[in-house]
């Protein structure tokens, strides 16, 4: 007999409908969860499996501009680039440790310092104020430092503020802002509200370090001591110091012009003699140079990574196009 119009399904039918609905909803939820997790992984920009810091002596790592991820390049081979590292705005690595500074979009935008192991897996994450500017890891991989712009985005502007931090991985102790370090300037203790530090470079003992301090409109090279937590100014007109592997020389940015167009040149300062010389790179360099070995510097310019002999001879050589933040985790 035909079922009358408007008749309700049987109890068994209703049970099967409910089971089917739950299965469909469960499958959809599972798919949504998987897609969301995949989206989070893509957003964090984790390293691909097998992409590590163990590529051998002299291997060059950079931030690939097109992808925003860390890449390994072979300057001697045309097109020799492997992109597989995390997404970073600034990157540095040494001694089996990497430091990745990230700027995440949002309202408000957020910045992070990611501490990575030799497999480029995240081991610590620190929220940061401002815009990533400089990143450095000591040769041992134990000491890390980063600088953030709190306001402004260029040293060429008349006013800016920085926040420079130091992290000791051996103890986990974090100096959130080194502006409170006791500073000796001109033989006297210096106190001023306009003190800003940036561009830390560590010595081999993981205690001594060099950095730039700005105060009263002038920049100074300072030598710092972690154990005594003190710093003293050595000389003026030094920015973004980078200590050589043998600890005898410092590559730095020297201001050679007050104009906004290419105000800096790359110089090398001998700590023992106090002598300095310009390198063969004559363009204006706004970067913290990297010693790839005892005699060579690498740096970013014009969206590319270049190198030049540190002794003032030779000529600049392009290492990688569409790249920045050079790092050599295992110098040759």
Language model features with spans:
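Beta-strand-rich domains and repeat architectures in extracellular enzymes and scaffolds
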Residues: 36-75, 80-100
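Blade-terminus and WD-like Trp-Asp/Gly-His loop motifs, strongest in beta-propeller folds
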Residues: 49-57, 90-97, 135-144, 194, ...
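Beta-strand C-termini and the immediately following turn/loop, strongest in propeller blades
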Residues: 60-66, 97-107, 146-153, 198-216, ...
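Structural motif
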Residues: 66-72, 107-114, 153-163, 217-222, ...
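Short loop/turn segments that connect beta-strands within beta-propeller blades
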Residues: 74-78, 117-121, 169-171, 224-229, ...
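Short coil/turn segments at the loop-to-beta-strand junctions that recur within blades
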Residues: 83-91, 127-134, 180-185, 235-241, ...
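Surface-exposed loop and turn segments in beta-propeller and other repeat-based domains
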Residues: 172-193, 321-332
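Blade-level signature of beta-propeller repeat domains, shared across WD40, Kelch, NHL, RCC1
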Residues: 301-308, 312-332
């Amino acid at each position: 007999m035909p079922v009358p119009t408007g008749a309700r399904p049987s109890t068994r039918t209703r049970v099967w409908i409910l089971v089917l609905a739950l299965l469909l909803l469960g499958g959809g939820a599972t798919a949504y969860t998987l897609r969301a997790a995949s989206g989070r992984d893509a957003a964090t920009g984790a390293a691909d499996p097998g992409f590590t810091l163990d590529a051998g002596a002299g291997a060059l790592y950079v931030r690939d501009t097109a992808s925003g991820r860390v890449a390994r390049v072979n300057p001697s081979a045309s097109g020799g680039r492997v992109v597989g590292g995390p997404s970073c705005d600034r990157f540095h690595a040494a001694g089996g440790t990497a430091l990745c500074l990230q700027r995440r979009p949002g309202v408000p935008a957020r910045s992070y310092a990611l501490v990575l192991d030799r497999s480029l897996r995240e081991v610590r994450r620190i929220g940061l104020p401002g815009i990533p500017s400089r990143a450095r890891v000591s040769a041992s991989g134990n000491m890390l430092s980063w600088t953030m712009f709190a306001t402004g985005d260029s040293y060429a502007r008349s006013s800016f503020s920085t926040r420079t931090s130091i992290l000791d991985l051996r103890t986990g102790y974090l100096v959130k802002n080194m502006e409170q370090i006791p500073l000796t300037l001109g033989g006297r203790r210096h106190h001023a509200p306009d003190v800003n530090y940036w561009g830390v470079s560590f010595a081999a003992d993981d205690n001594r370090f060099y950095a730039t301090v700005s105060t009263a409109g002038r920049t100074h090279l300072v030598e710092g001591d972690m154990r005594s937590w003190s710093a003293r100014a050595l000389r003026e007109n030094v920015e973004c110091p980078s200590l050589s592997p043998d600890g005898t020389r410092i590559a730095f940015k020297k201001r050679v012009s007050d104009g906004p167009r290419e105000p800096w040149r790359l110089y090398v300062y001998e700590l023992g003699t106090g002598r300095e010389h310009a390198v063969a790179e004559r363009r204006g360099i706004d970067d913290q140079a990297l010693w790839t070995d005892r005699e060579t510097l690498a740096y970013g310019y014009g969206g590319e990574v270049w190198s030049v002999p540190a002794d003032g001879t030779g000529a600049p050589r392009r290492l990688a196009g569409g790249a920045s933040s050079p790092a050599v985790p295992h110098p040759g």
